[in-house]
């Protein structure tokens, strides 16, 4: 059975020429939405995702706008509103050392270098220069950890464990 990963959500159409407005859920939108790539649409009703080939991609405000081969007007893409864009696991590709997919990081337990448990990574934010990991703490407010070498000391994906150095003012 194929394992699928969400890379975007179709939230609306854009214009009359078949463009769709996508909220990106992928780590690498410029790579994932490249012209010629194949994505899979999974509608809200379930069922097996079906392939579509990207014929154009551009960014508009906070959205990615895509068109697909064979879908040239708004009436043909209207049916996709609310659907998810997916890729199979074999399309994920290899990452460089020290790079991780969001789904690998989310759910990892976070401990200090002294072994104190801080919580679990629940979300990854990409505000600018580096990612920020949102740690759900057992009690209290969420903790924001920058993904930089000075803070993140070790990431063990197999054991779902991240070890961090607590810099002054971080907690």
Swiss-Prot record:
What's the chief localization of this chain?
Answer: cytoplasm
Q: GO molecular function terms here?
A: ribosome binding
Entry-linked Pfam families: PRC, RimM
Key words of the record: Chaperone, Cytoplasm, Ribosome biogenesis, rRNA processing
Answer yes or no on keyword Cell membrane.
no
InterPro entries, alphabetized: PRC-brl_dom, PRC_barrel-like_sf, RimM, RimM_N, RimM_N_sf, Transl_B-barrel_sf
Quote a single Gene Ontology cellular component term: cytoplasm
| Biological process (GO), any one | rRNA processing
Residues forming the PRC barrel domain are 97-170
Residues annotated as transmembrane:
none
The disulfide bridges present are none
Question: What start-end ranges are recorded for coiled-coil regions in this protein?
Answer: none
Q: What compartments host this protein?
A: Cytoplasm
Q: Show the HAMAP family listed in the entry.
A: Ribosome_mat_RimM (MF_00014)
Q: What does the entry's free-text domain comment contain?
A: The PRC barrel domain binds ribosomal protein uS19.
Q: Which PANTHER family match?
A: RIBOSOME MATURATION FACTOR RIMM
What does this gene product do?
An accessory protein needed during the final step in the assembly of 30S ribosomal subunit, possibly for assembly of the head region. Essential for efficient processing of 16S rRNA. May be needed both before and after RbfA during the maturation of 16S rRNA. It has affinity for free ribosomal 30S subunits but not for 70S ribosomes.
Protein family (similarity comment): Belongs to the RimM family.
Q: How does it assemble?
A: Binds ribosomal protein uS19.
> This protein is called what?
Ribosome maturation factor RimM
Q: Which organism is it from?
A: Bacillus cereus (strain ZK / E33L)
For this protein's source organism, the top of the classification is: Bacteria, Bacillati, Bacillota, Bacilli, Bacillales
């Amino acid at each position: 059975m194929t394992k699928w990963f969400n890379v975007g959500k179709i939230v609306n159409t854009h214009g009359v020429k078949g463009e769709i407005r996508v909220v990106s859920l992928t780590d690498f939108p410029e790579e994932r939405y490249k012209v010629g790539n194949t994505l899979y649409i999974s509608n809200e009703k379930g069922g097996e995702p079906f392939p579509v080939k990207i014929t154009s991609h551009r960014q508009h405000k906070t959205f990615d706008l895509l068109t697909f081969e064979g879908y040239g007007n708004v009436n043909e893409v209207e049916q996709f509103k609310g659907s998810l864009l997916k890729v199979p696991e074999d399309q994920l590709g290899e990452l460089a050392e020290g790079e991780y997919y969001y789904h690998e990081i989310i759910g990892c337990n976070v401990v200090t270098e002294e072994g104190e448990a801080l919580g679990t990574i629940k979300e990854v934010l990409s505000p600018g220069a580096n990612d920020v990991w949102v740690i759900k703490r057992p009690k209290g407010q969420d903790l924001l950890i920058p993904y930089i070498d000075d803070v993140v000391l070790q990431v063990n994906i197999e054991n779902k464990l991240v070890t961090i150095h607590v810099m002054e003012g971080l907690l």
